[in-house]
A protein has these predicted regions:
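Exported/periplasmic cell-wall-interacting domains
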Residues: 111-114, 126, 130-196
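Surface-exposed, secretory/extracytoplasmic low-complexity segments enriched in Ser/Thr/Asn/Gly/Pro
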Residues: 1-134, 139, 186-188, 193-196
Length: 196
């Protein structure tokens, strides 16, 4: 099963991704993708051999993506372009959101992590807490530990170079109306693709 895992696992792998504007990006890391549960599969195989049975079946997965297409991302995902401070959200191949954002503050060492992540949870409302702050938000969608997408009522501008000196603690600050559209159309497990 290790050999199968090497062949079929995509969890945290390096993948090629076509961006909203047609560029090819190499996406490394994150926690999205498929990974065969080697312990469960080894146990199943051992028991099948002892019992003398054969079966065509899907393997047990420790982690699973939403799609088994070529890139396993499919056509429902959030894409965050850190360099251009732009976020897009596609659902079933239809563009629902295209918005400027403010990501992690580069100068303070709070850059938003890059990679392909699975949306971990959804909360509305929520209070985001860290050293020296407690920020109430209406829409909270974490994808990498304490980093996530959320509305930011304290901001009046998004996009441009704001993130370099006045960015977030790593989160993706989003206009409230756009965060609402994403929140109301996304589900846990959807891929979040973040790149520079």
């Amino acid at each position: 099963y290790k050999r199968q895992g090497y062949k079929y696992d995509t969890f945290g792998c390096t993948r090629t991704f076509t961006t909203y504007d047609g560029r090819q990006k190499t996406i490394k890391g994150g926690d999205y993708g498929w990974a065969i549960d080697q312990t469960a599969e080894t146990e199943w195989l051992y028991n099948a051999i002892l019992a003398g049975t054969t079966e065509v079946r899907q393997p047990a997965y420790a982690y699973s993506g939403l799609c088994r297409d070529t890139n396993d991302i499919g056509n429902t995902y959030v894409e965050i372009d850190l360099t251009n401070q732009r976020m897009v959200f596609y659902k079933d191949g239809q563009l629902l959101v295209d918005t400027p954002v403010v990501t992690g503050c580069v100068r303070k060492g709070h850059s938003t992590p890059t990679g392909c992540f699975a949306l971990d949870a959804m909360r509305s409302p929520a209070v985001l807490k860290g050293p020296g702050y407690a920020s109430p938000v209406t829409y909270w969608m974490p994808f990498s530990g304490g980093v996530g997408i959320h509305d930011a009522s304290w901001r009046s501008q998004y996009g441009g170079q704001i993130y370099i000196t006045n960015g977030s603690h790593g989160c993706v600050n989003t206009p409230k109306d756009k965060a609402a559209i994403i929140y109301n159309n996304i589900s846990v497990g959807v891929p979040i693709v973040v790149y520079e």
